[in-house]
């Protein structure tokens, strides 16, 4: 988990950064998780890896801010995916009871946040960790 989530983000970023710096423009959007923000029983490795991605994002944002490259991350909460739908109904209901909006997120909502950060509207946003979790973590 640590190698995929941390090394994967680092190695993918390395591939694109030089070109972004050459053109003095670029957008990096990493995916973290609400679990990286709040932790979760039995998921110490996953939580640590996602928190590491957030810290990497903020550090890289500081390094590249004056060079035309923004670096942000999106931290989805529980989202309607195969992983969440496979959770037993009783546990899913307990999760929903903790989410003020009383529903799971949709993949499209996460995607729209990524598009926003990459669009002109996101020009002045860097080093941000955008939480998309229905109010689960504020």
Language model features: what each stretch is:
Residues 38-44, 66-67, 102, 120:
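Active-site loop immediately N-terminal to the catalytic Tyr-X3-Lys motif
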Residues 18, 62-66, 123:
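Alpha-helical segment proximal to the catalytic Tyr-Lys
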Residues 25, 103-132, 137:
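C-terminal substrate-recognition "lid" of short-chain dehydrogenase/reductases
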């Amino acid at each position: 988990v640590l190698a995929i989530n941390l090394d994967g983000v680092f190695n993918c970023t390395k591939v694109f950064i030089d070109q972004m710096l050459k053109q003095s423009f670029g957008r990096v959007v990493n995916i973290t998780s609400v679990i990286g923000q709040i932790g979760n029983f039995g998921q110490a490795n996953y939580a640590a890896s996602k928190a590491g991605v957030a810290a990497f994002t903020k550090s890289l944002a500081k390094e590249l801010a004056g060079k035309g490259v923004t670096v942000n991350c999106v931290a989805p909460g529980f989202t309607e995916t195969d992983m969440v739908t496979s959770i037993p109904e009783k546990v899913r209901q307990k999760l929903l009871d903790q989410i003020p909006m009383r529903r799971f997120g949709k993949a499209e909502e996460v995607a729209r946040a990524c598009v926003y950060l990459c669009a002109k509207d996101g020009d002045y946003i860097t080093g941000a960790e955008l939480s998309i979790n229905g109010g689960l973590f504020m």
